[in-house]
Amino acid sequence: EKFKPINMFKQLMLLGAAAQLGIFVTFLGALWLGFAPPEAGAIGIIGGADGPTAIFLSSKLANGVNMLADGTLVKNLIGPIAIAAYSYMALVPVIQPPVINLLTTKHERKIKMRPPRSVSRLEKQLFPIIGLLLTAFIAPSALPLLGMLFFGNLLKESTVTNRLANTASNALIDTITMLLGVTVGASTQADVFLTKDSILIFGLGAFSFIIATAGGVLVAKIMNWLSPKSNPINPMIGAAGVSAVPDSARVVQNMGLKNDPTNYLLMHAMAPNVSGVIGSAVAAGTLLSFLM
């Protein structure tokens, strides 16, 4: 069911890619502030709004163990990056609405989109397989992230592994979440977290979310201009390309209802929202392959 919105609105996958602009702009910003390239790459991924991806990339690039070309060690930024990523994911309902309002008109916010089409069982089962193969070619370094995402979806959609799907989506994920919280928390000692770098990381994280939201909205506006009048695109759904699932999609839904109580955009917004998860993992794999 996770990828059902993408199958309904395949053209909206582009918005999931557009919102990754925040990652690469923040990467350049971190370089400008004096961070080493691997550290800047790990900081940039905060804009992907995906906590596990941020932890994965920072543990590879900014782990305090890797050595730079000049012989110095990279800084251990796992704790500050993880906390910044999860903090701003929780603040999506605060960060995104002002950006959306700034970049869209009241008329655009009232645009109603076509209702979703039905998706066959075969489509649901083929999507994770094809998606895994394509992303394996594009960003093989991201396979630990994307492989688990697509595998979990396939467990659910196959309908023959219900026990495994239930375990993975309940007991297993709860256990892993607890372990993840404990291990990240243990890495945030005062000498690591209470530093000038942490302040810069939090500032860059906020900047990254704003740029990602703006990038998604602006590309959605362009898509709306290019779309036929019979199939318009509400520019607000571009903000859902920020892969905080499902918070970004809910922000778009609430703003749509606020401007028109009969305008339901949740399923439309979930398409770029879920594709943003894939996009952030591909971006992480790209950074990893260049910066390791």
Language-model segments: residues:
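Transmembrane helical segments that form the transport core of multi-pass membrane transport proteins
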Residues: 131-220
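Hydrophobic alpha-helical transmembrane segments in multi-pass integral membrane proteins
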Residues: 25-31, 180-192, 245-254, 282-285
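Entry/N-cap segments of selected transmembrane alpha helices
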Residues: 4-24, 190-217, 269-273
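C-terminal ends of transmembrane helices
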Residues: 1-5, 96-104, 154-166, 216-225
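Alpha-helical membrane segments and immediately flanking helix-loop junctions
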Residues: 1-6, 14-21, 38-72, 119-123, ...
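Juxtamembrane and boundary regions of transmembrane helices in multi-pass small-molecule transporters
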Residues: 28-36, 81-109, 218-229, 272-292
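Alpha-helical transmembrane segments
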Residues: 75-94, 202-212, 236-240
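Membrane-embedded hairpin module used as a gating/binding unit in multi-pass transport
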Residues: 84-160
